[in-house]
């Protein structure tokens, strides 16, 4: 989504170029190496071009995007095509819990400012609060310091991904979690322990997006045309209107031009996983749908 964000002028080019890789144990920088940036990675593979990336200098009439669903709905229902009508809202945060490093053998529970214990409670609260509002909350990165067997963790940094079908719901989840996290950090209701401090940093904010009706209509008509010869009693049931749970380039392009998306099934609904897979038939179906959708949209434009 970085390139589309730059193209839509929602992400400054300098910010995109300066994005740094998320370090892993295998990629931690040494004294002789700096973390890889987006710009250095593009240079390394000879992809750092000189063509301006902007909707003004390289305009589009519309944008159609083909993607695997990245979820289980199509594959579970035996459906062939998802007509994407919208993308849910999401916000990404980095949080830091600051407690105090102390010895595990000499510090009783009531004297500990245990950042990891506070984090454990926060993670449970995040899931419960999000679920109660029909949203999702996930932690994907956790860093614990100082990282010693016999030291109570004095600091925990973690990511928090909040998603929901409406922007307002995501805001409500965030507001409630801020309040609950403050109480957890203050050791209220825990019965034991000293206070910690929690800090929030917003990394990314993507409001809910509704796609263009003309583009949605073109995708829907094309999907029904492509599956019309399928050997089933009701081919209409093979096509499903769907909201995307994940962010895509279309989120940014939709801010500048009419946009919609096409989903095809993926095995077991898996994505961001080594076993991510879509069959050749499903890929061909998706390619046929996007081709017909583009043709239909052009006819509509010039009618």
What are these regions, as identified by a protein language model?
Residues 117-121, 285-292:
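Short amphipathic alpha-helical face segments that pack within enzyme cores
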Residues 2-168:
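Midchain, well-structured core segments that form catalytic/ion-binding scaffolds
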Residues 49-56, 106, 127-139, 149, ...:
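Flexible, glycine/charged-enriched surface loops at secondary-structure junctions
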Residues 9, 14, 163-167, 203-204, ...:
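Short beta-alpha connecting loops at secondary-structure transitions
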Residues 231-288, 297:
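Zn-dependent metallopeptidase/amidohydrolase metal-coordination segment
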Residues 172-182:
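Short amphipathic alpha-helices in soluble, non-transmembrane regions
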Residues 212-226, 230:
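Extended C-terminal subregions enriched in glycine
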Residues 140-148, 159-165, 195-216, 245, ...:
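A short beta-alpha structural unit
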């Amino acid at each position: 989504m970085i390139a589309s964000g730059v193209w839509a002028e929602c992400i400054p080019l300098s910010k995109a170029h300066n994005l740094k890789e998320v370090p892993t144990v295998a990629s931690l920088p040494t004294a002789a190496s700096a973390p890889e940036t987006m710009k250095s990675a593009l240079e390394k593979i000879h992809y750092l071009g000189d063509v301006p990336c902007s909707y003004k200098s390289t305009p589009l009439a519309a944008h159609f995007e083909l993607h695997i669903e990245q979820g289980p709905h199509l594959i579970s229902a035996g459906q062939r095509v998802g007509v994407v009508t919208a993308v849910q809202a999401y916000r990404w945060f980095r949080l830091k819990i600051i407690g105090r490093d102390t010895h595990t053998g000499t510090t009783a529970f009531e004297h500990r400012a245990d950042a990891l214990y506070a984090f454990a409670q926060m993670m449970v609260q995040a899931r419960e609060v999000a679920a109660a509002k029909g949203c999702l909350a996930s932690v994907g990165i956790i860093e614990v310091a100082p990282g010693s067997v016999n030291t109570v963790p004095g600091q925990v940094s973690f990511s928090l991904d909040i998603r929901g079908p409406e922007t307002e719901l995501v805001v409500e989840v965030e507001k409630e979690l801020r309040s609950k996290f403050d109480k957890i950090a203050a050791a209220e209701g825990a019965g034991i322990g000293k206070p910690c401090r929690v800090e929030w940093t917003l990394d990314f904010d993507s409001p809910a997006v509704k796609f263009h009706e003309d583009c949605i209509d073109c995708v829907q008509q094309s999907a029904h045309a492509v599956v019309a010869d399928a050997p089933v009693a009701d081919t209409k049931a093979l096509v499903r209107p769907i909201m995307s749970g994940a962010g895509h380039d279309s989120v940014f392009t939709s801010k500048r031009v009419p946009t919609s998306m096409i989903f095809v099934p993926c095995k077991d609904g898996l994505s961001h996983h080594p076993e991510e897979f879509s069959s050749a038939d499903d890929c061909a179906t998706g390619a046929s749908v996007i081709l017909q959708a583009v043709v239909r949209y052009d006819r509509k434009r010039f009618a």
